[in-house]
Amino acid sequence: VILTNNTALLEVLRQKWPDIPAKNWEIRPLTGLTQGSHYITDGVHQMVGRRQTWHGGTLGVNRQRENRILHKLSFVGIAPKVIAMHGDWLLLEWLSGTKVTAETFGLPSFQQSLAQIVANLHHHSPLGYSLQLKQQITYQWQQIDNRRLLPDWLRLHKLFMTAKMPTPLKIAPAHMDIHPDNLLMTSEGLKLIDWEYATDVDIGFSLATLFKGNQWSEIQQKTFLNYYCTYASGYIDIVLLEQKIKQWEPWVRYMMLMWYEVRWQRTKEPQFSALAHPLRLSFNLAF
């Protein structure tokens, strides 16, 4: 018998809270590029249910890893707390707060707050889950339609696979998917949600991902780094950090290109092809 998401989730809720009638639970899907998340309430409890799916696995999502990471970060105060891990389902607290708009996200005053929580995260000891970037890219490469792998792209891929990666400044935890939709301003301060891609990386790689993923201008990047490097938990040498971010930037672009290509391959949704297009152009891949 193939259970629908709601039926499978209801069974998990029934086992965890047997005294609550199944009809009392309200479940609705939450939006997101990788999907698989649901809002859950019985009128008293409020939770987020995040399911492990095969599709998410092709993008590197692992709910067991996410569960362990969130437990390790529970005292940092910038992430939702874990309620339970049951089978393929990760149940998290529902964070109430105000969504961060794209306009607010780019303001210097907000960048100051964001720089502080990123610096605090980078100050935490490694989580024990290092990003194996070349391994990830190799796996994603195998998911792409061979008809798209033209000679220029084959040469580019070989270049990245044989190139030496930049020497890390400092390996630290990173969220890896910071953008307005994954930020909430709560009564306890700024919080990050959706930690499914969290891993240990060089702080230069983490910041290059933040900057490139949000298309920040040079001024916005400089503003953020000025704040980041003034915090005790940040990195003191801004010049060295800027150099390292630049070294990582092409690797970040290639990582993003592979992610969008796999998403397009799996869903055929135009948004992923559109997101991949400027990245293809940046590598002179004309298709």
Question: Across the structure, where does each feature detected by a protein language model lie?
Answer:
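An alpha-helical support segment within catalytic cores of ATP-dependent transferases
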Residues: N5-P21, P126-M176, T186, D237, ...
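Conserved N-terminal boundary motif of the eukaryotic protein kinase catalytic domain
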Residues: P21-R28
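Active-site acidic catalytic loop and adjacent metal/ATP-binding pocket
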Residues: T34-G43, M47-G49, M161-F205, I219
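Glycine-rich, phosphate-binding/catalytic loops in enzymes
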Residues: E66, P108-S109, K191, A208-F211, ...
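Active-site activation/catalytic loop segments of kinase-like enzymes and analogous catalytic loops
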Residues: G204-Y235, P250-T267
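All-alpha amphipathic helical-bundle segments outside canonical DNA-binding/catalytic cores
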Residues: Y235-E249
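ATP/Mg2+ or Mg2+-diphosphate-binding catalytic cores
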Residues: M258-F287
